[in-house]
Amino acid sequence: MTAVVNIAAYKFVSIANPADLREPMLEQAGQRQLKGTVLLAPEGINLFLAGAADAIEGFLRWLRADARFADLQAKYSESARMPFRKLLVKVKREIIRMDHPAIRPEAGRAPAVDAATLRRWLAQGRDDQGRELVMLDTRNAFEVEVGTFRGALDWRIERFTQFPQAVRDNQAALAGKTVVSFCTGGIRCEKAAIYMAEAGIEHVYQLEGGILKYFEETDGAGFDGACFVFDERVALDAALAPQA
């Protein structure tokens, strides 16, 4: 059986009229028999799609022909079955809701740490400057329960809009440490890292590409359990395979 290719991708980029993209997205993804969800907002695009390999690549070629999405990076995995039941393209106020409009990743990101560097930091327990390393899980509590980085902070938030208050409540404990925010695919931890930096936390990084990119580029060292995903696969192990 030919494997189903799954992609997750996002980009923070100004979209003046996101509603104008909805029908073209539905048409291009639909004619390729892709399923999943695409979120469009004035701040950018966030998508999770699955289908045949050539269909996925064809859709990405079409999408990247738009200059706003030319450098869109996708994270890949495979599954034996289609993990989505239908195709949805939704227009939202934010592609990941935080309710802090001043946080605009397109205007400037927090520093990012790549998977290989993080793996080394985890092994040594410190960053390259010798600062204590703190892994901060920015996901919802039910996601964290499926799996997270060993020893990671879990503030037990129920939705991402609670993250800013959690930072205010816990900021003092992060002083002088290197904080790496992480999430499933990178989108939440990107906003989270910007918020923390603007709140005055000095040494803040985001995990480039999130947990999924860490699994893709390393052996998953330091991660306990599996990564929850919002589709019928439920969770992926470090080999990006659905957890049995």
From Swiss-Prot:
Keyword Lipid metabolism included in the entry's annotation: no
Stored InterPro entries: Rhodanese-like_dom, Rhodanese-like_dom_sf, TrhO, TRHO_N
Active site: C183 (cysteine persulfide intermediate)
Reactions that this protein is recorded to catalyse: uridine(34) in tRNA + AH2 + O2 = 5-hydroxyuridine(34) in tRNA + A + H2O
Annotated PROSITE patterns: RHODANESE_3
Enzyme Commission designation: 1.14.-.-
Record domain Rhodanese: where: 129-219
Top-rank EC class of the record's enzyme: oxidoreductase
Gene Ontology biological process: tRNA modification
Keyword annotations: Oxidoreductase, tRNA processing
HAMAP family the record matches: TrhO
PANTHER family associated with the record: RHODANESE-LIKE DOMAIN-CONTAINING PROTEIN 7-RELATED, THIOSULFATE SULFURTRANSFERASE/RHODANESE-LIKE DOMAIN-CONTAINING PROTEIN 2
Its biological purpose: Catalyzes oxygen-dependent 5-hydroxyuridine (ho5U) modification at position 34 in tRNAs.
Protein name: tRNA uridine(34) hydroxylase
Annotated source species: Bordetella pertussis (strain Tohama I / ATCC BAA-589 / NCTC 13251)
Encoding gene, per UniProt annotation: trhO
